[in-house]
Curated annotation (Swiss-Prot):
Residues 1-205, 1-207 are annotated as: CPSase. This is Carbamoyl phosphate synthase small chain. One of its GO terms (biological process) is 'de novo' pyrimidine nucleobase biosynthetic process. Small subunit of the glutamine-dependent carbamoyl phosphate synthetase (CPSase). CPSase catalyzes the formation of carbamoyl phosphate from the ammonia moiety of glutamine, carbonate, and phosphate donated by ATP, constituting the first step of 2 biosynthetic pathways, one leading to arginine and/or urea and the other to pyrimidine nucleotides. The small subunit (glutamine amidotransferase) binds and cleaves glutamine to supply the large subunit with the substrate ammonia. Pathway: Amino-acid biosynthesis; L-arginine biosynthesis; carbamoyl phosphate from bicarbonate: step 1/1; Pyrimidine metabolism; UMP biosynthesis via de novo pathway; (S)-dihydroorotate from bicarbonate: step 1/3. Composed of two chains; the small (or glutamine) chain promotes the hydrolysis of glutamine to ammonia, which is used by the large (or ammonia) chain to synthesize carbamoyl phosphate. Tetramer of heterodimers (alpha,beta)4. Disulfide bonds: none annotated. It is an enzyme of class 6 (ligase). Pfam families: CPSase_sm_chain, GATase. Coiled coil: none annotated. Its EC number is 6.3.5.5. It comes from Bartonella quintana (strain Toulouse) (Rochalimaea quintana).
């Protein structure tokens, strides 16, 4: 049985100008913002209180509609510096956003555009006036939901046709989205993290050369590696091992990204396996972690609801410490499938799902969470130093 859920917001609208229609036929009404049109995607919820610009521009959110549980939105505006997409003009992040409140006019010295106009520019459809926490409960009960988000300023909707559209989209399983968001050519990177009253600076040192395989990489990951004195060469997701080794890297990074890891594995896994055999230090994050797991013979699974937010407790078995981390993934490594020569290094304390691994006897490790944050806490920044410690050991013995 399907239902129509009207907007609960106190401000009144003569008729809804935006809808969220789930694959089961449920219709959620509200006020439209941002771009107009129709977009399909998997609906997930994000519990972060800040960083909406970074979240919406994370390429890992390709083909996803984000339900923000924090009620306020837009109060710091947007700027041209906090975008996480490597190629910001290509709009590789989320396709839709769902908000509790109407978008607030910005009050921040770094803002150069309000969120509503920014959403239009980036072709992101938004739905305001939704009981986002009730929608979150629905996702927690039923699991990840597929659907479509529609914005028409005139409020003209063919509900029957739109429900059929929502039912047709099959979801993220078996989708290789890394090929849609990856760089198309080699790119050199030297920008370091933002510093108060100074902005972003460039790295003049060249202590290490890192090749970063771009499955949908975030800018802040690159900045943190540059802060360690690394010269970084970003390469497309399908770059073969011969081209990578020809660049004489001191380490290789496997980036985050969207989609089903088993689909991306078709071309990524052979390269990763060859890199493991080369004994070059390897570090993977998010999708890179999942691809590394597949490369050693483990399995990945689709999660019930995924982990998306900046307040996730993760335990590091090596340091025996608990850190609060940012997460953004709907697939996970199946712990029981890890082979004997691979050690689990991190777990989520929410559901005990795998959050890290290392290959015993090899300078190779990865994590499911996002140590670069952006947005989120910096508890896991030490993982970048762990990577560079492996690189220094490798350079001494090479």
């Amino acid at each position: 049985m399907t239902q129509t859920i009207p907007s609960p917001n106190p401000w009144s609208i003569s008729r809804p100008t935006a809808l969220l229609i789930l694959a089961d036929g449920t219709v959620i009404e509200g006020k439209g913002a941002g771009a107009t049109g129709v977009a399909e995607g998997e609906i997930c919820f994000n519990t972060a209180m800040t960083g909406y610009e970074e979240i919406l521009t994370d390429p890992s959110y390709k083909k996803q509609i984000i339900n923000f549980t924090f009620p306020h939105i837009g109060n710091v505006g947007t700027n041209s510096e906090d975008i996480e997409d490597l190629t910001p003009l290509n709009c590789h992040g989320a396709v839709g956003a769902i908000f509790k409140a109407d978008i607030t006019y910005p009050s921040n010295y770094r803002a150069n555009e309000n969120l509503n106009q920014w959403l239009k520019t980036r072709k992101i459809i938004a739905l305001c006036g939704v009981d986002t926490r009730a929608l979150t409960v629905l996702i927690r009960e039923k699991g990840s939901l597929n659907g479509i988000i529609i914005h028409d300023p005139n409020g003209n909707f063919d509900i029957h046709a739109l429900k059929k559209h929502a039912q047709k989209w099959t979801g993220l399983i078996n989708l290789d989205l890394a090929k849609e968001v990856t760089s198309k050519q080699f790119v050199e990177w030297n920008e370091k993290p933002w510093v108060w009253n100074k902005g972003y600076s460039t790295n003049d040192a060249c202590n290490f050369h890192i090749v970063a395989i771009d499955y949908g990489i975030k800018r802040n990951i690159l900045r943190l590696m540059a802060a360690h004195g690394a010269r970084i060469t970003i390469v497309p997701a399908n770059t073969n091992v011969e081209k990578i080794l020809a660049m004489n890297p001191d380490g290789v990074f496997l980036s985050n990204g969207p989609g089903d890891p088993t689909a991306t594995a078709n071309y990524a896994v052979p390269t990763i396996q060859a890199l493991i055999d080369s004994n070059i230090p390897l570090f993977g994050i998010c999708l890179g972690h999942q691809l590394l797991a597949l490369a050693v013979g483990a399995k990945t699974i689709k999660m019930h609801q995924g982990h998306h937010g900046a307040n996730h407790p993760v335990k590091d078995f090596i340091t025996r410490k608990v850190e609060i981390a940012s997460m953004n993934h709907g697939f996970a490594v199946e712990t029981t499938s890890l082979p004997e020569h691979v050690e689990e290094t991190h777990i989520s304390l929410f559901d005990n799902s795998n959050c890290g691994l290392r290959i015993i006897g090899k300078p190779v490790f990865s994590v499911q969470h996002h140590p670069e944050a952006s947005p989120g806490p910096q508890d896991s920044h030490y993982l970048f130093q762990r990577f560079f410690n492996l690189i220094m050991d490798y350079k001494r013995t090479a």
